[in-house]
Amino acid sequence: MQVTILGAGAFGTALSIALCNTGKKVRIWSRNGQVVESLRTHGENSVYLPGFKVPREVLVHSDMGLATDGPAAILMCVPAQELRSLCNTITAASALEAGVPLLVCSKGIENSSLKFPSEVVAEMFPQNPVFVLSGPALARELASGLPCAMVLAGDEITTAETLASQLSGPALAIVHSGDLMGVQVGAVMKNIIAIASGIIAGMGLGHNASAIVMVQGMSEIKAVCEAKVGVAATETLIGLSCLGDLVLTCTAPGSRNMSFGSSVGKAGRAGASGQQKPMLVEGVESVTAMVNMGKALNLELPICSAIARMLHGQLGVRQAAAEILSAPVKSRLNV
C-alpha cells in the first residue's frame, strides 16, 4: 500500500516511521526547506522530531505534484489553521485524483469559519472521501514503535473499516468509527482541557483538582457533541478519540498543551510561557474559535471560556483556575 503524508511536523514524521515499519510505501512532503534537507541528508527531522531515524525507504518530497501522484491514501498532517492553505497547494499542483481517500490528522477548528477539519477538506475536494484519524498518540512514542491505538472516522463506514485494517500494524492498532463529528469535537476540546489541567498541576493544586478538570471537560465535550449532531455517541465519548486522548493529553509529560498550561501555572501569567513553547500548542490556537462556537450553539463552556479570557489578558491565572474548579461538575455524563 502506498501512502502520502502531507506535513512533516513531529506527528507526520512519526507516522511516516510507523507506517513504513508496517510495510507501507511511504512518501512525506514538506514545504519547510530545512526539514526536507534534514530528512534527505541525515534521515532525521532535526527540526520537529530530533533523535529518531526515518527509514531510508521513506521518500521525501518538496514537490506537491510528485508527492500526490498515485497514492492509495493521503494523510494530511498540518495544523488546523494551515489546512486550507495545504488544500490550495494541492489544488495548484493539479495532481489529486478523484476518489483518493483523504485522512485528516489536524486537531482544531478553522478560526475564520468555525469549521472542523473534515468540513474544510470536504469543501475543497468534494470528489474525494474524507476521513479523520485521531486518538491518543504522542509522536515520540509512535516513532519509537511503542503500542498505540487510534480511530479512523468517516461517513463511508465500509471504506473506513478497510483503511483502518490496511494501516494497522503490530504496534499500531487503528479502529474505525462512523462518528466523524464526535471524534473531531473530542480532538479539539481535549487540547483546551489539557491546558487547564496543566495550570492546575503547575499551581500545585493536586490530583483531585485535576480530576475535576477532566470530568468537567468531558461534560463540555458531550454538550458540544449533542449540540452539533443531536446525540453524543457513548462509544465515542468513552473511546480513544475523547476519553483516551483527553487522559493522555492531560497527564503525559510529553503533551505540549499540558506542559504549556503547567508553565503558565508555575509562572502565574500566560505571556512569558507562550514564548517558551516553539512547538505548536493546539489548544491555544483553537480556544477562541471554540468559545465562539459555544456561543453560536448557546452553550456554557466554563473551561474554554476561562482559558480564552486568560490568554487574552482578561483574566488572571489564579482567577482562571478558580473559575475552572468552581464550575459545577455536570451530571450530563450518563454514558
Swiss-Prot record:
Sn-glycerol 3-phosphate binds at residues 107, 135, 190, 245, 255-257. Its EC number is 1.1.1.94. One of its GO terms (biological process) is glycerophospholipid metabolic process. The active site is at residue 190. Disulfide bonds: none annotated. Catalyzes the reduction of the glycolytic intermediate dihydroxyacetone phosphate (DHAP) to sn-glycerol 3-phosphate (G3P), the key precursor for phospholipid synthesis. HAMAP family: NAD_Glyc3P_dehydrog. This is Glycerol-3-phosphate dehydrogenase [NAD(P)+].
